[in-house]
């Protein structure tokens, strides 16, 4: 499927006219076949259509690889669009419905979004918890639907070993928690003390509370 980006009818007509000569705009091809993505695969929970990405799944290394690739490729295409048609491209719209997962996978997507030249708007569809909130809060504009919720909490870890191994693990967790708190401090309206207290709990916040805490900018109301 050929993908088009436009901001007005005039630009749309120009793209359609030129695409007849050069074979169309190069599509993004991630993976899959005629029967769609295999169940449980990364593309089973990541869907790309034009400048919209639907991410409904775990924040894992496998899923982050596909998600990051999609964001980078759309960003590249939209920057080509900007130069070629001298028109501001639409933002990348990233819809998130995820209970979280790996903090390292989340950090990788955070860096991809922060390095995008095209604005990335994040939308909470249903829920965003744990590592998924790190991804959502770094968007240039952050939206949440009326009946959606968010949850932020401390890191979890399980291990066995010698006493020194546990000391090393605590140092590792302290390092990661410092980075997590830094992201929330920079991207929300919460104070350091407030962040520390909230992270101690496993408590869901509704859309109104998310706006109050600065986790999102705006509620998308129904109707």
Kindly label every feature range from the protein language model.
Residues 1-131, 138-223:
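N-terminal organellar transit peptides
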């Amino acid at each position: 499927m050929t993908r088009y980006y436009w901001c007005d009818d005039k630009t749309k007509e120009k793209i359609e006219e030129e695409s007849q000569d050069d074979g169309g705009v190069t599509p993004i091809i991630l993976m899959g076949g005629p029967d769609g993505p295999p169940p449980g695969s990364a593309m089973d929970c990541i869907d790309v259509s034009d400048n919209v990405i639907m991410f409904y799944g775990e924040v894992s290394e496998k899923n982050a690889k596909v998600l990051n690739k999609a964001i980078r490729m759309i960003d590249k295409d939209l920057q080509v669009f900007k130069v070629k048609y001298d028109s501001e491209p639409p933002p990348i719209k990233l819809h998130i419905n995820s209970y979280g997962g790996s903090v390292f996978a989340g950090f990788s997507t955070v860096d991809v979004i922060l390095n995008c030249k095209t604005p990335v708007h994040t939308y909470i569809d249903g829920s965003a918890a744990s590592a998924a909130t790190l991804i959502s809060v770094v968007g240039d504009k952050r939206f949440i639907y009326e009946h959606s919720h968010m949850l932020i909490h401390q890191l979890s870890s399980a291990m066995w070993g010698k006493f020194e191994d546990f000391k090393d693990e605590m140092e590792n967790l302290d390092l990661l928690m410092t980075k997590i708190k830094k992201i929330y401090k920079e991207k929300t309206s919460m104070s350091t003390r407030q962040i520390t207290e909230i992270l101690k709990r496993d408590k869901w916040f509704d859309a109104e509370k998310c706006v109050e805490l600065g986790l999102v900018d705006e509620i998308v109301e129904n109707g």
